[in-house]
Design a protein with these regions (language model features):
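Extended terminal accessory/targeting regions
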Residues: 2-165
Length: 165
């Protein structure tokens, strides 16, 4: 079973990297876009699909090739608010199954930014490494300056028992 998950994960990562739309087996909402016939149309993996549907329908996002709050998205996929990404991570973690863990690893390895309103970032205080990539987990901020919209790194997905909520 582990080899099967690895093959699915690698295929999904390659598809995402090349902009191909594939949907996680058993879901209609988990993948670039969706194949659902409507909001109430869910796949056989209902709980996982509900997490993805909620994430897809989050209104706090910067669509590809657009700007919001002075932030530009030059990527092929939307950049979601940090609040939306946090809800998605918590939803996946709450399922405690192999499918949600695999999706979390794939998604949070290929998507690396979110946006929020906060004090200006001065530097990164704590980093997280995953193979050859690093992300900032906590920032030193300049509280003396006005708040602004800015990008933040998304933490890599780890086993739910070690997730911070």
């Amino acid at each position: 079973m582990g080899a099967q998950i690895l093959v699915v994960a690698l295929a999904a990562m390659l598809a995402i990297a090349h902009g191909l739309g594939i949907t996680v087996p058993g879901t209609k909402w988990c993948g670039p876009g969706n194949i659902a016939d409507g909001y109430d149309d869910l796949g056989t993996d209902v709980e996982l699909d509900m997490c993805c549907r909620a994430h897809d329908n989050c209104n706090e996002k910067i669509s590809p090739s657009t700007e919001l709050h002075g932030l530009s998205n030059n990527d092929l996929f939307p950049i979601f608010s940090c609040a939306c990404e946090s809800k998605f991570r918590q939803c996946l973690s709450s399922l405690h199954n192999v499918e949600s863990a695999a999706l979390g690893r794939i998604y949070f390895s290929t998507r690396n930014q979110c946006f929020a309103y906060g004090p200006p970032i001065a530097s990164c205080e704590e980093q997280q490494w995953d193979l050859f990539m690093k992300r900032c987990l906590s920032y030193k901020v300049d509280e003396s300056q006005p708040y602004r919209w800015q990008f933040y790194d998304l933490a890599f997905y780890t086993h739910p028992s070690s997730e911070e909520n």
